[in-house]
Regions:
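Residues embedded in well-ordered secondary-structure elements
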Residues: 38, 216, 247-249, 253, ...
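Catalytic Cys-His active-site segments of thiol-dependent hydrolases/isopeptidases
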Residues: 268-273
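Extended glycan-interaction surfaces of carbohydrate-active proteins
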Residues: 1-30, 55-80, 157-175, 180-196, ...
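Short alpha-helical segments and helix-capping/turn motifs at coil-helix boundaries
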Residues: 35-36, 243-245, 286
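CBM-like, beta-strand-rich accessory domains located in the C-terminal region of large
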Residues: 175-182, 274-450
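Aromatic-lined, polymer-binding surfaces characteristic
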Residues: 1-135, 140, 147-148
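Short acidic-hydrophobic surface loop/beta-edge motif
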Residues: 51, 225-230, 258-260, 385-387, ...
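Carbohydrate-active enzyme catalytic cores, enriched for enzymes
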Residues: 56, 96-267, 323-324, 435-436
Length: 450
C-alpha cells in the first residue's frame, strides 16, 4: 500500500496537472483542442481524464462535473466514424481509439449505474460491427491509412461488443495484455463478464438485425468494399477496395487503393503506415517526402508523372456497384484526384470473382485531350519475379499469385524499394511505353496452385 504521504502527493499532482487545467479551460469556454477533435485523441484523452477523476476525486459533485464533460464532448470523437460505422483512421486506430471509447463508456456507466450510456445510438452498433465487417479472411484486414501491415481487430473489442449487444455466441474471455501495452487502456481485459449490457431499444434492435452478408461488406459513406469467398469453396482469395477522398483522418492520398489476401497472407496491395512516425510525417509536404504516405507508395496510377492531390476535392465517385453470389464489381471515377488539365477521365474498375480458385482484376481506363504518360503500380512485400513481358509471379509463405498485365500498348516495368520506419516493400511500376491520349491497363491476379 502507498503511504499517506505518497497518496497526498499524487492527489496534489493530479489536481495541479490535470483537474484544475481541465476545469479552467472548460469554465472559460476554451476547451483543449482534443475535446472537439474528431479522431482517436478525443476518446483516449477523455477516457484518461474521466477515469482519473472518478478514481481520485472524493467529492461527488466534482466527479459529476467530469462525467458531464465526457457526456458533452464524447460525441466529437464519434464524428470521426462514418454513420455506417466505417473508421477512416484504419484498423490500428480503431483498436486504440474505440478501445478507449469502450473504457470511457464503462467508466461512466458504472459511475451512473447505467443512467448515462454513450452506446445508446444505432451508430454505435454499426461502429461495433466494423471489427468483423472489415476483415477479409482469416482475420486479415486491409492496411488502409496509418494501419500497420498485418494488424487485425483486437479480439477483446469484438468480444466486448458482442456481449454488450447480446449477440455473443460465447462468454467473455479474460485476456492478459502483452508486455509493453498501456495498462490504463488494457487492464479492462483482466475482468471478463463485466461488460455493462446495452438497453435494447427498438432502434438498437433494428440496427443489430441489419443484414450482414458474409460474402461482402460495402461501406457506402466511405466507398469501401470487402469481398470474401464462399464458405467451403476452393477459393481462399479475398480483397478490399477503397474509394473515399483524400481529406480523411490519416489519409494517404490513395483513393483507388486495394488489398489482396490469399489464405493467411497479404499478397499485394496497400502496405499500410509506418510503425513509428517521422517528426514531420503530418506536415503538408509529407506525401511527397514519404512514399508510404503519398500515391507513389500505393497501388494507384500516376498521371503524367503526377501523384494524387491532397484534400476533399480528390473524391472517388462511385459509378457502379454490383454485388452477387459469384462476382462483385466496383467502379469509381478518379479524375478529380489528379491536377492536370490534360486528363479528361480516369476510371478504375475492380472485379472480384469468387468462383473456382478466384480472381481479382483491377482495370484503369483513361481519356486525355493531349498525349500523356500513364503508369499504374503493384505494391507488395512478397518475393516476386517477372516471368515474361506480361506476367509476374508473387510468392509469400506457402502462397503464390500470378499477375497478368493486359494493356492497350507495350509496357515497361520499374522496381522501387520503399521503407519508412517499417517493413520494406516493393513498388512495381507498370508504364505504357508510349504517351497516348487514351488507353487502359488491366491487372488480373489469380492464385497459382501446384
Amino acid at each position: 500500500r502507498l503511504s499517506p504521504e505518497v497518496r497526498a502527493r499524487v492527489q496534489c499532482a493530479f489536481r495541479e496537472k490535470v483537474f484544475r487545467p481541465i476545469h479552467r479551460c472548460l469554465e472559460t469556454n476554451k476547451p483543449f483542442w482534443w475535446f472537439t477533435v474528431t479522431n482517436n485523441w478525443n476518446s483516449v484523452c477523455l477516457a484518461g481524464v474521466t477515469g482519473a477523476a472518478l478514481a481520485l476525486l472524493p467529492d461527488r459533485e466534482e466527479r459529476a462535473y467530469f462525467v458531464a464533460a465526457a457526456e458533452k464532448y464524447h460525441v466529437y470523437g464519434m464524428k470521426g466514424y462514418a454513420d455506417d460505422g466505417y473508421c477512416s483512421e484504419g484498423v490500428g486506430y480503431y483498436n486504440y481509439g474505440f478501445r478507449a471509447y469502450i473504457l470511457l463508456r464503462e467508466e461512466v456507466c458504472r459511475a451512473t449505474q447505467g443512467k448515462v450510456d454513450f452506446f445508446r445510438t444505432p451508430k454505435f452498433v454499426r461502429i461495433a460491427q466494423y471489427g468483423k465487417k472489415i476483415q477479409m479472411l482469416n482475420g486479415i484486414c486491409p492496411a488502409y491509412s496509418d494501419c500497420r501491415i498485418g494488424l487485425t481487430v483486437d479480439w477483446f473489442i469484438n468480444n466486448y461488443c458482442d456481449n454488450v449487444l447480446g449477440t455473443a455466441p460465447y462468454f467473455e474471455k479474460c485476456v492478459f495484455p502483452s508486455n509493453g501495452r498501456n495498462l490504463s487502456l488494457y487492464s479492462i481485459e483482466f475482468f471478463p463478464n463485466q461488460a455493462w449490457k446495452l438497453e435494447q431499444s427498438d432502434e438498437i434492435k433494428q440496427a443489430i438485425q441489419e443484414e450482414y452478408d458474409p460474402l461482402h461488406t460495402f461501406y457506402e459513406k466511405a466507398g469501401i468494399l470487402v469481398a470474401r469467398p464462399s464458405e467451403k469453396s476452393n477459393c481462399d482469395l479475398a480483397i478490399s477496395a477503397k474509394g473515399g477522398n483524400n481529406a480523411e483522418n490519416h489519409n494517404h492520398n490513395d483513393i483507388g487503393s486495394y488489398a489482396v489476401s490469399l489464405g493467411r497472407e497479404t499478397v499485394a496491395g496497400d502496405q499500410g503506415g509506418p510503425f513509428s512516425y517521422p517528426g514531420d510525417y503530418f506536415s503538408a509536404d509529407a506525401p511527397d517526402k514519404y512514399p508510404i504516405k503519398g500515391s507513389f507508395g500505393h497501388p494507384v496510377p500516376l498521371v503524367d508523372g503526377l501523384q494524387q492531390v491532397t484534400g476533399a476535392r480528390a473524391q472517388a465517385i462511385v459509378l457502379n456497384r454490383e454485388l452477387t453470389r459469384t462476382k462483385d464489381l466496383f467502379s469509381i471515377d478518379l479524375t478529380s484526384a489528379y491536377n492536370t488539365p490534360k486528363l479528361e477521365k480516369l476510371l478504375r474498375t475492380f472485379t472480384y470473382d469468387r468462383t473456382d480458385v478466384g480472381s481479382f482484376t483491377v482495370e484503369d481506363k483513361f481519356f486525355a485531350n493531349a498525349p500523356i504518360r500513364f503508369e499504374t503500380a503493384l505494391t507488395t512485400s512478397a518475393d516476386w519475379k517477372q516471368i515474361d513481358a506480361n506476367h509476374l509471379l508473387l510468392a509469400v509463405g506457402n502462397e503464390q499469385m500470378l499477375v497478368t498485365i493486359d494493356a492497350s500498348g507495350e509496357v515497361e516495368l520499374t522496381s522501387d524499394t520503399i521503407q519508412v520506419n517499417g517493413p520494406a516493400y516493393t513498388r512495381i511500376g507498370i508504364i505504357l511505353k508510349k504517351t497516348v491520349k487514351d488507353g487502359q491497363i488491366r491487372l488480373i491476379m489469380c492464385p497459382k496452385r501446384p
